[in-house]
Amino acid sequence: MDDRMVDQSMHDEESSFELSLRPTKLRQYIGQSTIKSNLEVFIKAAKMRQEPLDHVLLFGPPGLGKTTLSNIIANEMEVNIRIISGPSIERPGDLAAILSSLQPGDVLFIDEIHRLSSVVEEVLYPAMEDFFLDIVIGKGEEARSIRIDLPPFTLIGATTRAGSLTAPLRDRFGVHLRLEYYQELELKEIIVRTAEVLGTSIDDESAIELAKRSRGTPRVANRLLKRVRDFQQVNEDELISIATTRASLQLLQVDDEGLDYIDHKMMNCILEQYKGGPVGLDTIAVSIGEERVTIEDVYEPFLIQKGFIERTPRGRKATPYAFEHFSKKNGKKE
């Protein structure tokens, strides 16, 4: 899968850029108002009791700020944070080394926590619940179990696939927070703030236009802004104008709904080749040259959210809205 302008996952070169944009306190965090309000209470109560915050599960689509929120939680609790990825913890010993290095109250953030292996996950249960580890040393008749006490800590797990978590792991999180797609006005505020960080200016109309095409995702909004800024600077414009914004996005193949060329390819497959469906995911994958799992995890969720396709027992089916929208796009009469 090529890097797409509207891909909600992080591109390799974006990590340092995203770090420079991240707020450090809840009051600076834009959007997710319900989550912010709840976290303010949970954090204040934990600090009043002089206890670590309860374990937190953050879930929702990629690019909505799960890592940012975990850093904010650590900052608000005034503790250190350790950030790791689920797939990088290959053996129980790896997890034991990480947990035993934590200081009292520290935050351990595990991204893609749904990808932990079952043997690693089982070691995590007593660590989360009672703050100890049972490690088996040796093999066969010489094997023995050693208990290691751990300092109280907060585990923050992040996942885009909450349904893939096992029930025992999911139930050990005291706080469950689902991040939702952002509203246009929230994205506009983020875009204006990012433009300031980048040392450029953008008018309100252009910021709204970018927000409309950002798939409800701050990461996409910031990526589009960076590319539009390139066009602005090459054109030697004083600020990012609506004319530059629209022309740039057209060249980037991002339409007014935030759909890119791959989205159009997938919708054309369903609408034109299979007359609106239903059509199976495997068939779509072969038709557009992508893997089934990529379609299911990356492309399809936004098309469903926009109301263009629906899942049925027999496969994916285009909605009446999709027929209307794409017939207009292609200049066809309904």
Swiss-Prot record:
Residue numbers spanned by region Head domain (RuvB-H): 256-334
Binding-site residues, DNA: R292, R311, R316
UniProt keyword annotation of ATP-binding present: yes
Alphabetically ordered keywords of this record: ATP-binding, Cytoplasm, DNA damage, DNA recombination, DNA repair, DNA-binding, Hydrolase, Nucleotide-binding
SMART domains linked to this entry: AAA (SM00382)
Pfam families from the UniProt entry: AAA_lid_4, RuvB_C, RuvB_N
One MF term in the entry's GO annotations: four-way junction helicase activity
Catalytic reaction annotation: ATP + H2O = ADP + phosphate + H(+)
Family annotation (CDD domains): AAA
Top EC group: hydrolase
Large ATPase domain (RuvB-L): region residues: 1-182
A single Gene Ontology CC term: Holliday junction resolvase complex
UniProt-annotated binding residues for Mg(2+): T67
Binding site for ATP: L21, R22, G63, K66, T67, T68, E129, D130, F131, R172, Y182, R219
PANTHER family: HOLLIDAY JUNCTION BRANCH MIGRATION COMPLEX SUBUNIT RUVB, PTHR42848
Role played: The RuvA-RuvB-RuvC complex processes Holliday junction (HJ) DNA during genetic recombination and DNA repair, while the RuvA-RuvB complex plays an important role in the rescue of blocked DNA replication forks via replication fork reversal (RFR). RuvA specifically binds to HJ cruciform DNA, conferring on it an open structure. The RuvB hexamer acts as an ATP-dependent pump, pulling dsDNA into and through the RuvAB complex. RuvB forms 2 homohexamers on either side of HJ DNA bound by 1 or 2 RuvA tetramers; 4 subunits per hexamer contact DNA at a time.
Subunit structure: Homohexamer. Forms an RuvA(8)-RuvB(12)-Holliday junction (HJ) complex. HJ DNA is sandwiched between 2 RuvA tetramers; dsDNA enters through RuvA and exits via RuvB. An RuvB hexamer assembles on each DNA strand where it exits the tetramer. Each RuvB hexamer is contacted by two RuvA subunits (via domain III) on 2 adjacent RuvB subunits; this complex drives branch migration. In the full resolvosome a probable DNA-RuvA(4)-RuvB(12)-RuvC(2) complex forms which resolves the HJ.
Entry protein name: Holliday junction branch migration complex subunit RuvB
Name of the encoding gene: ruvB
